């Protein structure tokens, strides 16, 4: 693994083990990142098994070529540089119409956070960027400097759940009328100055929720996850499984709702039985999310908000 792409994988064994790996199966890592889940999954595959790994960050793929070299050499892994919202079309283009399992590790990866110039972190001074795919045009700079007051309030409330959304949007509007807002430090200071003294005393960085909101907007993270998870459930073979790690309430709520819709059925009252074509296609493997162990929490601070949900295809 390259030194500039260090990443501690969260819920490593739980996420992969819950897929109930078949040695000759076809699997997908929808969020390659530091390749931790991919490496562990590949270690359980036989010579006829295969892994397709998605990431829209070329650096992640370059790193994985090094970390997973022995599996690259045996032809057991295929890397796909694309947003996982294009999961189905990419796999079908490669002749894959059915998979035995898929895992997701949602949100931004540690290497992206740690790479200062990517502009994801409110802890380091950097240009406002926040693109997971550096080839796309929309950046955090565009959101902060061109979105209307009402659009800023909308995304701050919806994606950041910050009760000071209106005050922050108004302050951004005032500052950018005088000059453009170019850096993460400038934005973090604006956010901080928009909050009450009482709020600033609370635990956690005052800019965290707003940075999350802008990042989700720039990358359409929830829209992409929604589309991809639905495609994944359609691609699963019977008895195939899907594991999803989330890191904040919006991701977890979305995953929980998608799994619920696929594992329950609404039928007209008085119907004596549920016809086969109305039966749910999925079942929940775990009713409540799996959380990191105390040992993992002590070893990896990023694991604190992680939740793992798993579902299985039943028809």
Swiss-Prot record:
Q: Name one GO cellular component term.
A: cytoplasm
Listed A to Z, the keywords are: Cytoplasm, Methyltransferase, rRNA processing, S-adenosyl-L-methionine, Transferase
**Species name for this entry?**
Streptococcus agalactiae serotype V (strain ATCC BAA-611 / 2603 V/R)
Q: Where does the record place a coiled coil?
A: none
Q: What is this protein called?
A: Ribosomal RNA small subunit methyltransferase H
Q: What is its EC number?
A: 2.1.1.199
Q: What does this protein do?
A: Specifically methylates the N4 position of cytidine in position 1402 (C1402) of 16S rRNA.
Organism phylogeny = Bacteria, Bacillati, Bacillota, Bacilli, Lactobacillales
Q: Looking at the Swiss-Prot or TrEMBL record, what is one Pfam family this protein matches?
A: Methyltransf_5
Cellular compartments annotated: Cytoplasm
């Amino acid at each position: 693994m390259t030194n500039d792409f260090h990443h501690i994988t969260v819920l490593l064994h739980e996420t992969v083990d819950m897929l109930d790996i078949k040695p000759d199966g076809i699997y997908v890592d929808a969020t390659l990142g530091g390749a931790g889940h991919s490496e562990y999954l590949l270690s359980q595959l036989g010579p006829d098994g295969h892994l397709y790994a998605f990431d829209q960050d070329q650096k992640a793929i370059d790193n994985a070529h090094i970390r997973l070299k022995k599996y690259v050499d045996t032809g057991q892994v295929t890397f796909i540089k694309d947003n996982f919202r294009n999961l189905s079309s990419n796999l079908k283009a490669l002749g894959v119409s059915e998979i035995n399992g898929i895992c997701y590790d949602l949100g931004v990866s540690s290497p992206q956070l740690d790479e200062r110039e990517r502009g994801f972190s409110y802890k380091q001074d950097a240009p406002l960027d926040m693109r997971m795919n550096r080839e796309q045009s929309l950046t955090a700079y565009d959101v902060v400097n061109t979105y209307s007051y009402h659009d800023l309030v909308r995304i701050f409330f919806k994606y950041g759940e910050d009760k000071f959304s209106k005050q922050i949007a108004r302050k951004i509007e005032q500052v950018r009328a005088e000059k453009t807002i170019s850096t993460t430090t400038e934005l973090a200071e604006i956010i901080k100055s928009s909050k009450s003294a009482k709020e600033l005393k609370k635990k956690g960085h005052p800019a965290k929720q707003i940075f999350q909101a802008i990042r989700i907007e720039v990358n359409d993270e929830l829209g992409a996850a929604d589309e991809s998870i639905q495609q994944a459930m359609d691609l699963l073979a019977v008895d195939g499984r899907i594991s999803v790690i989330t890191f904040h309430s919006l991701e977890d709520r979305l995953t929980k709702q998608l799994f619920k819709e696929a594992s329950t059925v609404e039928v007209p009252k008085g119907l004596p039985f549920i016809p086969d074509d109305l039966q749910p296609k999925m079942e929940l493997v775990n009713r409540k999310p799996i959380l990191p162990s105390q040992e993992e929490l002590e070893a990896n601070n990023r694991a604190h908000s992680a939740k793992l949900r798993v579902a299985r295809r039943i028809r």
